[in-house]
């Protein structure tokens, strides 16, 4: 049985840890409210923008030039991995890394073995995971979530779009956490570029196509709207991931606080038993000493 001093030290240590996890839970809860609000607000905006884009693009003549929807032979792939800069968020980052590994194994193993797969890591933890594999990310964005805005996210989205336009990459996949609720985050793997044609085809053959009046022309509007829509979509990925991170950290810290509470109960019980055993031992020694004197 451990000594009373050892148990007291462990109780003090666990109590200190509990205070830290409780404080982190409260901080994450405060940040989550703002991050969740921003993620919820951009969803209808992004969906409406994409709906307008699809209706306009579907009404264009077949064969109209759309560089962002151009399907090319897949010679080089870019995977954008969206993680966090900090840990203590449960399996938030580990699940993203697992999803990236699964994506490569299931769809792009030949490209990967031929060293034709590059990574962009948004968040420190993604870059660390790739480094552990003996590789390095082609580009890292750290600290982006400290002051996340459309302007701060624009640099990353424009780099990805330009890399696709110049032919450096033939396809871009994005892996991120979509926010569902505080306790649930859904791993999403989406093809960012080229723009998938299924949605446009569905709109083209649907009866809900909207009859827009264009000024100056459809082609010019689409030319301007597609890049903006892509930037909004990329920004949405980051907002979803940011809200998911705070939700995951809040849940993890809540669980850690509860675990610390249970551990404190067990340690206090151990302390009381050790103290009782020590007192019993002292009483027995006193009684034994008194009997020895009487004899």
Curated annotation (Swiss-Prot):
Assembly notes: F-type ATPases have 2 components, CF(1) - the catalytic core - and CF(0) - the membrane proton channel. CF(1) has five subunits: alpha(3), beta(3), gamma(1), delta(1), epsilon(1). CF(0) has three main subunits: a, b and c.
Bilayer topology: Peripheral membrane protein
GO cellular-component term (any): plasma membrane
Cellular localisation: Cell inner membrane
Record GO biological process: proton motive force-driven plasma membrane ATP synthesis
Annotated PROSITE patterns: ATPASE_GAMMA (PS00153)
GO molecular function annotations of the record: ATP binding; proton-transporting ATP synthase activity, rotational mechanism
InterPro entries named in the record: ATP_synth_F1_ATPase_gsu, ATP_synth_F1_gsu, ATP_synth_F1_gsu_CS
Domain of life: Bacteria
Main location: membrane
Alphabetically ordered keywords of this record: ATP synthesis, Cell inner membrane, Cell membrane, CF(1), Hydrogen ion transport, Ion transport, Membrane, Transport
Xref: CDD domains: F1-ATPase_gamma
Function: Produces ATP from ADP in the presence of a proton gradient across the membrane. The gamma chain is believed to be important in regulating ATPase activity and the flow of protons through the CF(0) complex.
This protein's name: ATP synthase gamma chain
Membership in a protein family: Belongs to the ATPase gamma chain family.
Source taxonomy: Bacteria, Pseudomonadati, Bacteroidota, Cytophagia, Cytophagales
PANTHER family found in the cross-reference section: ATP SYNTHASE GAMMA CHAIN, ATP SYNTHASE SUBUNIT GAMMA, MITOCHONDRIAL
Any Pfam family matching the protein: ATP-synt
Organism: Cytophaga hutchinsonii (strain ATCC 33406 / DSM 1761 / CIP 103989 / NBRC 15051 / NCIMB 9469 / D465)
């Amino acid at each position: 049985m451990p000594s009373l001093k050892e148990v007291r030290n462990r109780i003090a240590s666990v109590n200190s840890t509990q205070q830290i996890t409780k404080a982190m839970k409260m901080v994450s809860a405060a940040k989550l409210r703002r991050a969740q609000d921003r993620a919820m607000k951009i969803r209808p905006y992004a969906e409406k923008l994409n709906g307008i884009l699809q209706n306009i693009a579907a009404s264009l003549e077949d064969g109209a030039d759309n560089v962002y929807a151009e399907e090319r032979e897949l010679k080089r792939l870019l995977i954008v991995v969206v993680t966090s800069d900090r840990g203590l968020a449960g399996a938030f980052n580990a699940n993203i890394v697992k999803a990236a590994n699964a994506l490569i194994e299931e769809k792009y193993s030949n490209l990967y073995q031929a060293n034709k797969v590059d990574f962009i890591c948004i968040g420190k933890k993604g870059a660390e995971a790739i480094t552990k594999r003996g590789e390095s990310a082609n580009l890292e964005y750290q600290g982006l979530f400290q002051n996340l805005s459309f302007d701060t996210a624009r640099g990353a989205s424009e780099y990805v779009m330009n890399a696709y336009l110049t032919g450096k990459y033939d396809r871009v996949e994005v892996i991120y956490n979509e926010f569902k609720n505080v306790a649930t985050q859904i791993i999403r793997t989406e093809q960012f570029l080229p723009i998938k044609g299924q949605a446009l085809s569905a709109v083209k053959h649907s009866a809900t196509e909207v009859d827009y009046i264009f000024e100056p022309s459809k082609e010019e509007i689409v030319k301007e709207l597609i890049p903006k829509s892509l930037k909004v979509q990329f920004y949405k990925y980051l907002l979803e991931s940011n809200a998911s991170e705070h939700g995951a950290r809040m849940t993890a810290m809540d669980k850690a606080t509860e675990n610390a509470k249970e551990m404190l109960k067990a340690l206090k019980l151990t302390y009381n038993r050790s103290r009782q055993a020590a007192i019993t031992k002292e009483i027995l020694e006193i009684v034994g000493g008194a009997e020895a004197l009487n004899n």
